[in-house]
Amino acid sequence: MTPNVSWGRRIVTDVAVALLVAAVFALFTRAFLVQAYRIPSESMEPALLVGDHLLINKFIFGAGAGRWGPLVPQREVRRGDLVTFQGIEDPSQELLKRCVAIAGDEVEIDAKRLRLGGTAVDESAYVVHSDELVYPRSDFLHETVWRRDSFGPEQVPERSLFCLGDNRDISRDSRFFGPVGTDLVRGRPLLVYWSRNREAGPWRFRWRRTLHVPR
């Protein structure tokens, strides 16, 4: 075997090993650490816009939250957290909503106003309503209509969360499909790494949203 052939095979082998290691690392990262996510609808406006591409921290809400101390920053989901979770109505989908209540909380929505334990919650910093009409509980309206504006009171079960969209009047969330089991939670948004406004054209990027941290 000539030196050139031997050297060529070594290069091919090194490249193949490097690609394999990179692929394994990418799969590990996506499965356990970070995942890309695209906002498909207006249900989380104004915090997140259609066309926002996010990095999701899949490690922060691990099952062993707090077990490893300050070296591994894991914790439980808190009220106000943005979370991604496996869809309840369609498990093939992954949804992003805001957790508004945790296990043990009594949730009520009265004329669009969120109440926890009977106390009104100030959501003015992030919630918007696109429809001024308020649907009351009624025997003449289907439940899926008035539950948008009138819900509960109901207690969030153990190991569950109550999650709502910020664009409250157009979001399909826990008001309709019920509480979200903590075992379905996938992660929390880290930042917007890219954003594109499709309606404005194929090359209309929202550069100002790059590295934006959603709250």
For the regions a language model picked out, list residue spans one by one:
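Soluble "head" domains of membrane/secretory-pathway proteins
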Residues: 2-13, 28, 32-215
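Alpha-helical transmembrane spans of integral membrane proteins, capturing the lipid-embedded, hydrophobic core
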Residues: 15-19, 23, 27
